[in-house]
Amino acid sequence: LGGGPGTYLVEFLRRWPGLHGAIYDLPATLRVARRILNERAPWAVARSDFREVDYTAGELPGPVDAIFMSNIIHSEDEAANRGLMRKCFRALAPHGILVIKDHIMNAGLTEPAAGAVFSLYLLLTTRGRDYSFEEVSGWLREAGFSDIRLEPLPSPPFTSSMVLARKF
């Protein structure tokens, strides 16, 4: 969801040869993704769907086995993120998994430091900010998810973490 130029999609497809992937994003982004993937990874295009989806409007396509969101929740306010978690839950097949990659902050919203500084920028440019694991896991529980866990990514190079949640 919000697959951008397809960077993560290509790596997922490379890692799992039997996987069929999809990018759900806005029309302009899909045009860029298709151009880049046709040039650099045409094999990935054959194993992927490209669908125009505005996650802020309407339901998400489904059922799907997994949803990967990278750097989306920090652009939205709490109410929009709660709604997005509910949409993801409805789009997932039973036993599906949601993976959220973003700056996931500590309870005091002070670490990681890069996320705290980025939140200042977000407050000026979006409706969002970086959220704590407690906040994100609360939205996920409200939406019906379980087995919610935080998986930090190696730092450096990453300043992000992943939150994983299951639909049972």
Could you say what each language-model-derived stretch is?
Residues L1-F168:
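Alpha-helical subdomain
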